[in-house]
């Protein structure tokens, strides 16, 4: 959310993400940091600093958010609900209440859900009636059971969002989650991001020595990846049809080039959009 908040300080024509809630949802120290980026030199220094963690990281994160936002906007007339897996401090559900009144299920670990509830109370005063916070651990709990306890129905045409999550899960959990989503109504949509499997196995580090050391060597935080050529067949196993797959080069052309900003992207992470058959 720091990225989305910082992007609000870019002029509208150069901004990659529009989200006026982003800064408000951050804890106080991060709000102070974001406030400092109203000064262009500080903002540019922060963006350049992100390159030390992972070259192209800033552009990748911003572009994936735009890709997901565009797909959700295109689908609003055709869906009955939204499910956000690994919601964290994501503001998408609250931006959505300005446009439509459909149920939005935000799923995350219990500790993150508790923090989200406090944050929403601080920013909005109360949780919107259309938003349901669902606490569970995808590694151990059943997703559909937890959703059903909060009013989810299998006849809903749902827009599922899984942004920046799959790499943190085991392959068993990713497959079990997709197996559960077999029950989604035809016409449901799924948008997700994934890192490439050759990064996970260490074959290609995509120039991100610091990131690889942090998520694969010092701590085993990332576990799962795919290769772009595998995605269609992988989804088809669970009744989903790949509609669009967007790599960094395509997303840069779509979102960054028109702004005139000189950002680089990494080939590490891709985005995919699918429909339930």
Model regions and ranges:
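Glycine-rich phosphate-binding loop signature in dinucleotide/nucleotide-binding domains
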Residues: 75-78, 150-156
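Rossmann-like AdoMet/SAM-dependent catalytic core
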Residues: 201-277
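Conserved beta-strand signature within the Rossmann-like core of class I S-adenosyl-L-methionine
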Residues: 178-199
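Rossmann-like AdoMet
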Residues: 1-83, 89-134
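S-adenosyl-L-methionine
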Residues: 121-154
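Short, conserved loop/helix-junction motifs that constitute active-site signature segments
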Residues: 96-101, 152-154, 182-186
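A short SAM/SAH-binding and catalytic strip from SAM-dependent methyltransferases
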Residues: 152-173
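A short, conserved alpha-helix within the catalytic core of class I
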Residues: 131-133, 142-144, 168-183
């Amino acid at each position: 959310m720091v990225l989305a908040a910082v992007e609000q300080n870019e002029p509208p024509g150069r901004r990659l993400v529009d989200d006026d809630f982003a800064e408000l949802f951050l804890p106080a120290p991060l709000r102070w940091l974001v406030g400092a980026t109203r000064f262009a030199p500080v903002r540019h220094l922060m963006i350049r600093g992100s390159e030390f963690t992972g070259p192209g990281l800033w552009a990748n994160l911003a572009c994936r958010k735009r890709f997901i936002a565009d797909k959700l906007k295109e689908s609003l007339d055709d869906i009955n609900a939204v499910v956000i897996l690994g919601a964290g401090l994501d503001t998408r559900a609250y931006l959505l209440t300005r446009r439509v009144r459909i149920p939005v299920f935000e799923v995350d670990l219990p500790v993150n859900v508790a923090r989200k509830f406090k944050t929403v109370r601080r920013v909005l005063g109360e949780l919107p009636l259309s938003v349901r916070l669902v606490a569970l651990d995808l590694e151990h709990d059943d997703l559909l059971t937890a959703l059903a306890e909060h009013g989810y129905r299998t006849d809903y045409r749902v827009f599922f969002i899984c942004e920046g999550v799959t790499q943190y899960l085991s392959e068993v959990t990713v497959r079990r989650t997709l197996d559960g989503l077999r029950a989604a109504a035809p016409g449901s949509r799924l948008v997700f991001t994934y890192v490439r499997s050759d990064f996970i196995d260490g074959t290609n580090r995509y120039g991100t020595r610091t990131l690889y050391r942090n998520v694969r060597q010092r701590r085993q935080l990332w576990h799962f990846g795919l290769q772009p050529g595998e995605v269609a067949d992988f989804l088809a196993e669970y009744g989903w049809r790949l509609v669009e797959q967007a790599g960094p080069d395509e997303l840069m052309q779509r979102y960054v080039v028109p702004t005139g900003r000189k950002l680089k992207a990494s080939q590490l992470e891709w985005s995919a959009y699918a429909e339930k058959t």
